[in-house]
């Protein structure tokens, strides 16, 4: 039997910040991976978010505040400071 896979693809302008190692697992229970893990309250786990530079991140964590337009990228602490906060239009693919 074949499975039907539904995929939603859309563009969204997101307020993007960065976070670094806390020594804890993500809200989904996995260990965060630099350059891969991101946090979002409004997107399901497993959602792929592609930034304008072509890098793709996967939602594996939550903010916990019910934000609808925010994304937090997991990266090393020095890179977090360089990243700051950016408003970017991103491609979003939900599972």
Regions found by a protein language model. Give the residues of each.
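Positively charged n-region of N-terminal signal peptides that target proteins for export
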Residues: 1-3
């Amino acid at each position: 039997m074949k499975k039907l896979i539904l995929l939603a693809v859309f563009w969204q302008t997101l307020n993007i910040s960065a976070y670094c190692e806390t020594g804890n697992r993500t809200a989904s229970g996995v260990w965060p991976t630099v350059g891969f893990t991101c946090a979002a309250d409004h997107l399901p786990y497993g959602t792929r978010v592609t930034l304008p530079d072509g890098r793709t991140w996967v939602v594996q964590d939550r903010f916990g505040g019910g934000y609808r337009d925010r994304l937090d990228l997991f990266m090393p602490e020095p890179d977090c400071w360089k990243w700051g906060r950016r408003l970017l239009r991103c491609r979003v693919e939900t599972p």
